[in-house]
A protein has these predicted regions:
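A general structural signal for well-ordered alpha-helical segments in protein cores
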Residues: 21-22, 69-70, 180-184, 210
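Basic phosphate/pyrophosphate-binding loop/patch that engages nucleotide-derived ligands
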Residues: 9, 23-37, 137-138
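Short strand-turn motif at the edge of the Rossmann-like AdoMet-binding core
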Residues: 14-16, 44
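Single conserved hydrophobic/aromatic residue that forms the stacking wall/gate
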Residues: 1-12
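Rossmann-like dinucleotide-binding domain that binds NAD(P)(H)
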Residues: 49-117, 121-128, 201
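C-terminal helix-rich "cap/oligomerization" subdomain common to oxidoreductases
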Residues: 113, 186-227
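NAD(P)-dinucleotide binding in Rossmann-like oxidoreductases
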Residues: 96-98, 113-183, 199
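Residues embedded in well-ordered beta-strands within globular domains across many folds
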Residues: 38-41, 86
Length: 227
């Protein structure tokens, strides 16, 4: 098969699935460590907004930023697809987003066919670094994939206690290991006849969820996700 027909060219777009912390959540979920999945909470905040020129062509926060979280949420939900979504956005600190008809802050609530809830929180800016966290809550427990810090040192002094280093400030640094795992997986796929775990259809579905989020933003109510 060709690279295109096997969907190998589309693998790189879902690097978050390859993040050691995020993928470990999936492994523990499959092993039944937290029982039945009930709720997914994803926090994704960038250190700073991209350039105005980039924002103008980005398609908006739901198609440019939250779309990655939609894919990650589906990764955890598995075959239990999301069927409805409520989305909202606002601008508080950076009013220039109003002129772009975009948002610096966005939140979405999704629900699967079987009732699993998902809350996604996005921000175009975050003073303490690249904030990337995932929480899976189940009938028997909870597992969390936390932020990656510059180091694991904690400082205690007469001025502060448990002062920690800052989080990563660039997505390539934050997902450095994820990109490496992705390349390793891609190399294995090239040497075999196997197909990737995710492909074009996953990207298409994420776009469909993003479009439904925009519909909800306008209607100010839950919308059925149109696949």
């Amino acid at each position: 098969d060709s690279v295109a027909s096997r969907g190998l060219g589309d693998v790189y777009k879902r690097q978050r699935r390859y993040d050691p912390g995020h993928s470990s959540l999936k492994s523990n979920l499959i092993k039944g460590k937290i029982g039945k999945l009930e709720k997914i909470i994803i926090t994704s905040r960038d250190p700073a907004a991209p350039s105005i020129n980039y924002l103008k062509a980005s398609g908006g926060i739901f198609k440019d930023m939250m779309i990655h979280d939609f894919d990650l949420a589906r990764y955890y939900a598995g075959k239990d697809e999301f069927v409805s979504i409520f989305a909202t956005g606002s601008n508080i600190s950076n009013k220039y987003f109003n002129k772009l008809k975009d948002f610096e802050l966005a939140t979405a609530i999704l629900k699967t066919k079987n009732g699993v809830q998902c809350i996604i929180s996005n921000s175009r800016h975050c003073s303490f670094g690249y904030d990337q966290r995932v929480e899976l809550f189940g009938s028997k427990g909870m597992i969390i994939s936390d932020n990656i810090k510059e180091n694991e040192i904690s400082l205690y002094s007469n001025k502060s206690t448990n002062a920690r280093s800052s989080f990563k400030h660039f997505f390539i640094e934050r997902y450095d290991q994820a990109y490496k795992e992705q390349l390793n997986d891609l190399a294995k796929l090239f040497r075999s006849n196997l197909r990737p775990k995710s492909g074009f259809i996953d990207g298409k579905i994420s776009i469909q969820i993003a479009e439904s989020a925009i519909l909800s933003l306008k209607s100010k109510k839950f919308e059925k996700i149109k696949y």
